[in-house]
């Protein structure tokens, strides 16, 4: 994987930094694992904007990724190829199982075409294999971690993400997440060994606003540039600083204000994130 800085042949190329991976499949994705993906423009069924800054962008197909990996225990799979997925920052791997079925999974770092992967209690400890947390040695790096047995991976799914298994006590294991948070997870939950691929994703630079628009992201207007009717920071004579601590358009504190309010799962957090 190489980091390529473009020559400034035009204003739109001047700040472009690309992450080039020669191993990525250059053809079409596996058609049976594709689904239609409709665009909402950030609107709900009433036509009202529920998520700002969404709209436009290139047409995409959704890739059906297997986040559970619990119904192919003991069946060996060969990595056919590593593919780009427009729906996520990580790459995906197309697996061909010994029974003839093909599935996509999140591609682990270091796994390439031709590698053998397997899931289940007897799977060897190597990147890409999926096991229950109780079968994974303490100190191992994992990703694609379940929070409820059988629900599928919910933690550490984006590019370069991982967590470290640091303790095992009773029916729980303790994980240290990249954020610094330490939390308990049931040892029956599954995880995949290793870290997620495409860890260089954070080094890329799109270089121009249009590249963001291709991805379906619309501009973000500052509150201080609005009228008082549109935002708490709006209005004023001439340029102003807003006159108060940063808030959202609805008056809630933003830019670093804590928003977590799930007391039900607080007991699972051993140490809050940094």
From Swiss-Prot:
CC annotations in GO: large ribosomal subunit
Keyword annotations from UniProtKB, A to Z: Ribonucleoprotein, Ribosomal protein, RNA-binding, rRNA-binding
Swiss-Prot/TrEMBL GO biological process terms: cytoplasmic translation
Subunit structure: Part of the 50S ribosomal subunit. Forms a bridge to the 30S subunit in the 70S ribosome.
Source organism per UniProt: Pseudomonas savastanoi pv. phaseolicola (strain 1448A / Race 6) (Pseudomonas syringae pv. phaseolicola (strain 1448A / Race 6))
Compositional bias of kind Basic and acidic residues: 263-274
HAMAP family: Ribosomal_uL2_B (MF_01320_B)
Taxonomic superkingdom: Bacteria
GO molecular function: rRNA binding; structural constituent of ribosome; transferase activity
PROSITE patterns on file: RIBOSOMAL_L2
Function: One of the primary rRNA binding proteins. Required for association of the 30S and 50S subunits to form the 70S ribosome, for tRNA binding and peptide bond formation. It has been suggested to have peptidyltransferase activity; this is somewhat controversial. Makes several contacts with the 16S rRNA in the 70S ribosome.
InterPro entries: NA-bd_OB-fold, Rib_uL2_dom2, Ribosomal_uL2, Ribosomal_uL2_bac/org-type, Ribosomal_uL2_C, Ribosomal_uL2_CS, Ribosomal_uL2_dom3, Ribosomal_uL2_RNA-bd_dom
Protein name, UniProt field: Large ribosomal subunit protein uL2
Region annotation Disordered: where it falls in the sequence: 28-54, 224-274
Family under the similarity heading: Belongs to the universal ribosomal protein uL2 family.
